[in-house]
Design a protein with these regions (language model features):
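A residue-level marker of the well-folded mature domains of exported/periplasmic proteins
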Residues: 41-391
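Short, Lys/Arg-enriched N-terminal segments with co-localized hydrophobic residues
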Residues: 1-19
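Bacterial N-terminal signal peptides that target proteins for export
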Residues: 17-30
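C-terminal motif of bacterial Sec signal peptides marking the signal peptidase cleavage site
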Residues: 36-39
Length: 391
């Protein structure tokens, strides 16, 4: 049995349509004191959302066959057009509107000061379920859930400590799929160096970086190679991150961070930086085919189509399906606070298609990746990262 790990150990458990588990009962334990949420906001408009320069923007729409359930969503500062986890999460909400007949509303945050105000505005409009998108809304969402026990909450890409049982974490063990990405990068590099960088040093970012580094290490052990990982030391948990302020939106900072890795010899980069990752795409495209990226969160060839020739594959998270299933659980009266943990085993995370790189990935590497995926899913390969979600 192969076992990879750095730092403290956190246990873990989980391309898309099968994330229907963990929505049945066992209430979560409520711990820690409630946190106060302040501020008030204008209720979401009864019009489709339009882009504005205001602090936040919102919309409230209903379907023709209403179910009586109102499901709502608040973005982080990257917004719903981030071509990443906010946009993917919103797709799940909009699918629920179409297929389940629920009414939906969304509010877009322009700064972190909007989080509490926006969630309160959704509470005030009588949402049955409020979905917060992203780790940065952690404390605000926990506080709101404690203050509003009759409202159901879910949070994407975060597992809050001390959350009440009306708050469901929707999280993904991307260490598993990033391990595959690391193995693939090590197999394809021509320079013997691959790289990764993050937006911020937070668990939902470093989980990718840990998995990626361990996948490279596994490839080296299997093949007797010495491919180097630049930008992240999984043992010391030190590495390259996009400069402040607003690192997930700092495209120029993402480009300069990627360029540093390219200058050091990396020819494949895994940017874990939201919209700032577009800077990495710009940097590799400028290399004239000498370097490429592995994208994260969503299929980059769909969300960043103009860069598809530079995207080998993507480490996806089934956020849209997880959001849809959370809404369905509310509609069906089966919602609870147990975390949903997407994994390779249930296709809640994985690698997307190779698209333009399909003919460039050797058949033996594709076969090896299938074996690696199977061995991770079965537990034969153990990946250990302090950032992995708790069961």
């Amino acid at each position: 049995m192969w076992f990879f790990g750095f730092g403290s150990i956190a246990p873990f458990s989980v391309r898309r349509q099968s994330v229907k588990k963990k929505f049945l009962a066992i209430p979560a334990v409520v711990v820690s004191a409630a946190m106060a949420m302040t501020g008030c906001a204008k209720a979401p408009d009864e019009e489709p959302a339009k882009d504005t320069s205001a602090a936040s923007s919102s919309s409230d729409t209903g379907s023709t066959a209403k179910s009586g359930v109102k499901a709502c969503m608040v973005s982080d500062t990257a917004g719903f057009t981030d071509k990443s986890f906010n946009q993917t999460s919103l797709a799940g909400l909009e699918r629920a509107e179409k297929e389940l007949g629920v009414k939906i509303a969304k509010v877009e945050s322009k700064s972190d000061k909007d989080y509490a105000v926006n969630i309160k505005s959704l509470v005030d409009t009588k949402c049955d379920l409020i979905v917060s998108v992203g780790f940065l809304l952690d404390k605000t969402t926990v506080a709101a859930a404690k203050e509003n026990p009759n409202v159901k909450f879910a949070i994407v890409d975060d597992q809050p400590q001390g959350a009440p049982n009306n708050l469901k974490p929707l999280i993904f063990n991307t260490a598993q799929s990033s391990f595959e990405a690391g193995y693939l990068a090590a197999a394809l590099t021509k320079t013997g160096k691959v790289g990764t960088f993050g937006g911020m040093k937070i668990p939902t970012v470093t989980i990718f970086m840990d998995g990626f580094a361990q996948g490279v290490e596994y490839y080296n052990k299997q093949k007797g190679k010495d491919v180097k990982v630049l930008g992240w030391n999984a043992k010391s948990q030190d590495g390259q991150f996009v400069p402040q302020p607003d690192p997930f939106q700092n495209v120029a900072g993402g480009k300069s961070t990627a360029q540093t890795l390219l200058n050091q010899g990396a020819d494949i980069i895994l940017p874990v930086a939201g919209n700032a990752g577009n800077g990495a795409l710009q940097a590799v495209k400028a290399s004239g085919g000498k370097s490429n990226v592995i994208w994260v969160d969503a299929d980059g060839c769909r969300t960043q189509a103009s860069y598809c020739d530079n995207i080998i594959t993507s480490v996806y998270k089934g956020m849209d399906v997880a959001v849809f299933d959370a809404v369905k659980a509310v509609k069906d009266g089966k919602f609870n606070g147990d975390p949903y943990i997407g994994s390779l085993a249930d296709k809640g995370t994985g690698l997307s298609d190779f698209h333009t790189f399909d003919s460039k990935v050797p058949a033996d590497v594709k076969k090896e990746l299938k074996t690696v995926e199977k061995d991770i899913a079965s537990g034969k390969i153990k990946i250990v990262s302090a950032a992995q979600p708790l069961k």
